[in-house]
Amino acid sequence: MTTAHILGFPRIGAQRELKFALERYWRDGASADAERALVDTGRALRAEHWRIERDAGLDCVTVGDFAWYDHVLTTLAHVGGLPRRFGFDAHALTLADYFAAARGNAAQPAMEMTKWFDTNYHYLVPEYSPATTFGPGVEWLFDEVREARALGHRAKAALVGPLTLLWLGKARDGLVERLALLPRLVPAYRALLARLREAGVDWVQIDEPIFSLDLPDAWRDAARPTYEALAPGAPKLLVATYFDDASEHAALLKALPVAGLHIDLVRADAQLDAFVADYPADKVLSCGIVDGRNVWRNDLDRSLARLAPVRDALGERLWVATSCSLLHVPVDLAHEPRLDEELKTWLAFAAQKTREVAALRDALVKGRAAVAAEFDDAAAAAAARRTSARIHNPLVKRRVAALTDADARRASTYSVRAAAQRARFGLPLLPTTTIGSFPQTPEIRRARAAFKQGVLDHLGYLEAMREQVRIAIDKQLAYGLDVLVHGEAERNDMVEYFGELLWGFAITSNGWVQSYGSRCVKPPLVYGDVYLPEPMTVGWASYAQSLSAKPVKGMLTGPVTMLQWSFVRDDQPRATTALQIALALRQETLDLEKAGIGMIQIDEPALREGLPLKARERAAYLDWAVRAFGIAASGVADDTQIHTHMCYSEFGDILPSIAALDADVISIETTRSNMELLDAFETFDYPNEIGPGVYDIHSPRVPDADEIERLILLALERIPAQRLWVNPDCGLKTREWRQVDAALAAMVDAAKRVRQKVEEAVPA
């Protein structure tokens, strides 16, 4: 019978139970009681998620998709591959050890973190050296298998595959080629798979999303011998590709000695023919037809029409699935009582998507009539969405159509603007600033909750937030920062805040997804044409500027990041939606400038994240992404300084496009990579000003002035002092004031030391 399954379920819980349990555990100092409570929470969440999968009608539940912090880190823990610098006993690894690798400790900084392919999820980057070894690791996966079996579930295990695990890591300490470690890694996987078979697991899903990339020949060539070594003694293996087209590797994948393949038909529908043609008779083909990365309801009739010929060709060897893990979507639409009812009919979250998968399986096996009510309801929702008047705004469409190339360019070159800005601001060498946000304290959260509950009126809420702005300005003046920010106390999220104020966006109550660790975000829904009805940030920026003679930056989230960190409508090109958002932001920059704000930061942390996985598609993306930023930023005068910020990015392959943004100042995240990201600037002469991060805000660890000074000096080896800024890696929202106070004081101290050294080195 055709099998219905998913590649993974969100791990955080419908009410973010895992987030809160993790934070209690860390807050309580990882005590025995706190660890028991955390373990109990994890067990309860897994049981609930398996119940949802079973009740939806899936043929098996997925185990191994749960992780305490990150599934890549958990896979390393399973195969004994955590970084050697921590000195952990791989087989006796504790939760405290695991979290130390993720978050750092007094002796070692945290592992580097970067984006999971082109998503907004962040994984911890494996560290590989010539001394790296692998072997038996933690028992967590086997514990989960036992839990699932005890609850009566048929369990399919899921693991990050060995090739992907190596690909995602970084070579250190003289290791030339990560693939050189494959002979050490394969035996660890082989032992793990053999134990899963002994535990009664019939199927193991091996995630190899790197087969959606343009792989070097050496990595392609490694696939067959790797799986020839893994298959004997293992359960049936389902090699899963997702996020893009794997058809260029179709012949290779079909020849692997595994029991099945999974392909993503949402992101790459055209690849289906390449796989179905001459598909091996001994393999199942799992078709990812339900979108694991977006929230729009599946057009079941359309999906059925796509799958029916595959069913005719493969029979029961066709499996129906989500395109990728549901990690990237919220848990359950049932927890959205306040969402607009019409909009709600257009949506499906993880729980609903599990049922869509099962409904498609039922229609293939029993006929559409067996699930006619579900199919008819989905068809009605799709028709209503196509014709709804709330989606289309003729004014917005006319404004987008009227855009010219000149609208996306500043009036003057950078050198002309820089002279005007130096004359206006008179900043010192190596100016210090922050990226934007300051700690979201319990006081801020209480005020926001009281306002949302109607306990605090609007004026009371505004005054509470203004008090937080005053605190932020006073603290920055005490640190001695040169350029200030208002702290963003009024913003619960850098995208959601704007989504609440722009037409064409909708905000959920519990549409949370995991970004990393305990960090969750609630992406807005872009359902229609985007329009700015009134200024969004001018009042806050103007008030903050009134408190100091030093410049205060206006803070906006850029059009590409708004797009990347939202669930975006799928009925028009993303480029069109980006231009609509850019036009709204352009009006906001002009309003800020008119109010006297001389520095405006338009954050684009997701620019690199949006880069297509296929090289052939990147130029087109970068063209419209750069144009959208230009539309947002280019209406202002020469002496208005435009900043931008990017994080978690490898920049080398897109530096020309970053330069084309023509921001006067760019800040980037570099601390965890020890300024390695700046290596690209040795061969590319970046023309404008740059602030490489010198303080890792993702770790509770507080650096001292000596450490920051060392990083500034490293940056000066690549960036001229006249164009170098000093700032943290990212916003400080998730940190505590005691950490921020110490770190920023150290940062200013370090900048002053280096400034003095540079000035003393310049001949009078």
Curated annotation (Swiss-Prot):
Pathway(s) where this gene product acts: Amino-acid biosynthesis; L-methionine biosynthesis via de novo pathway; L-methionine from L-homocysteine (MetE route): step 1/1
The enzyme's E.C. designation: 2.1.1.14
Gene3D superfamilies noted in UniProt: 3.20.20.210
BP GO annotations: methionine biosynthetic process; methylation
Residues that, per the record, bind L-homocysteine: I435, G436, S437, E488, D603
Any one GO MF annotation of this record: zinc ion binding
Alphabetical UniProt keywords: Amino-acid biosynthesis, Metal-binding, Methionine biosynthesis, Methyltransferase, Repeat, Transferase, Zinc
Cofactor mode of binding and number, as noted: Binds 1 zinc ion per subunit.
Pfam families linked to this entry: Meth_synt_1 (PF08267), Meth_synt_2 (PF01717)
Reaction equation(s) it catalyzes: 5-methyltetrahydropteroyltri-L-glutamate + L-homocysteine = tetrahydropteroyltri-L-glutamate + L-methionine
Binding site for L-methionine: I435, G436, S437, E488, D603
Residues of the active site: H698
Annotated SUPFAM superfamilies: UROD/MetE-like (SSF51726)
Keyword Transcription regulation on entry: no
Cysteine pairs bridged by disulfides in the record: none
Purpose: Catalyzes the transfer of a methyl group from 5-methyltetrahydrofolate to homocysteine resulting in methionine formation.
Family of this protein: Belongs to the vitamin-B12 independent methionine synthase family.
Annotated protein name in UniProt: 5-methyltetrahydropteroyltriglutamate--homocysteine methyltransferase
